[in-house]
């Protein structure tokens, strides 16, 4: 009986160590405290969309865990778009600017044709290129198929990044982790 008890104890300790190892390996590579913008702190992403010709600006906010707001765009028009990130009522976009060498935005328009130019100034241009906090959208065709959308992804610490178009996305990375992801519907 004594050997059975030791075997059970060995199995229990092994199972506990296995669980601890898996929990630790599922966390980010660095401490959350060391992360300049932990993904758990982002609650809202706002796009300020300025119709360049009409000089009118409207804001569209994606709130984490809620539905996708719809941004009306017109074929043939150009828009200047600014992205802001929020933690509750606190604008944390400056934290992304401060860590511009560690962040990159990908704009994916899978059911539309939109040409994107990054307009970031030196405050949001780092070693990886322009983060994408300020962009110009030249809309060719908003509704290329049903349910057009923009999938916006903020990547933290990519090994490399490219601002070029990659399929339907403007920007691509290798490595890194997703800090935030938002979906905005598009309409004409």
Identify the role of each PLM range.
Residues 2-5, 19-47:
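Bacterial Sec-dependent N-terminal signal peptides
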Residues 8-17:
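Sec-dependent N-terminal signal peptides
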Residues 28, 92-130, 143:
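Extended, polar beta-sheet/loop recognition surfaces of beta-rich domains
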Residues 49-74:
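N-terminal edge beta-strand
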Residues 72-101:
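Short, well-structured hydrophobic secondary-structure segments
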Residues 74-78, 109-112, 140-150, 188:
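A short, structured loop/turn motif at beta-sheet edges
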Residues 80, 85, 140-168:
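Internal, hydrophobic beta-strand segments that form the core of beta-sheet-rich folds
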Residues 165-188:
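Short beta-strand elements
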